[in-house]
Amino acid sequence: MGVIEFLFALAQDMILAAIPAVGFAMVFNVPVRALRWCALLGAIGHGSRMILMTSGLNIEWSTFMASMLVGTIGIQWSRWYLAHPKVFTVAAVIPMFPGISAYTAMISAVKISQLGYSEPLMITLLTNFLTASSIVGALSIGLSIPGLWLYRKRPRV
């Protein structure tokens, strides 16, 4: 993949990630003045995850580092705009949730219950379930670490 193709793919990924970020921000009753920042932060998070995955990191670690970036930027923006960090960060990480792997794991579980046990279905179920669980864990831990680190009252050393 050339540089131009990568930049177009990155721009497309970021634009398409901003749409659900704004949608979920509207569901969560985020103030109108913060919607554009939720979209931008969702695009930054998903774009940084794509860059990390393209550079060779797996999806779990890429998601963890992207959610740490989203958490850090959200804390900084909350100081600038006098809002709670969750106003920006929660809607911004929603596009990174593992919908496909969770859906595939669920469909495999339904097929196992209907057709009976088979090893390929069980491998598909466990692989996708563990991937989805790892990504959700990476999102939650990565989003909470910047708050624990930046709001710490005691010295770090």
Curated annotation (Swiss-Prot):
It is a multi-pass membrane protein. Coiled coil: none annotated. InterPro entries: ThrE_2, ThrE_Dicarb/AminoAcid_Exp, YjjB. Its main location: membrane. It is found in: Cell inner membrane. One of its GO terms (biological process) is succinate transport. The chain crosses the membrane at residues 8-28, 50-70, 87-107, 129-149. Keywords: Cell inner membrane, Cell membrane, Membrane, Transmembrane, Transmembrane helix, Transport. It holds the Pfam family ThrE_2. GO terms for cellular component: plasma membrane. It comes from the Bacteria. Belongs to the ThrE exporter (TC 2.A.79) family. Involved in succinate export with YjjP. Both proteins are required for export. The transporter is composed of YjjB and YjjP. This is Probable succinate transporter subunit YjjB.
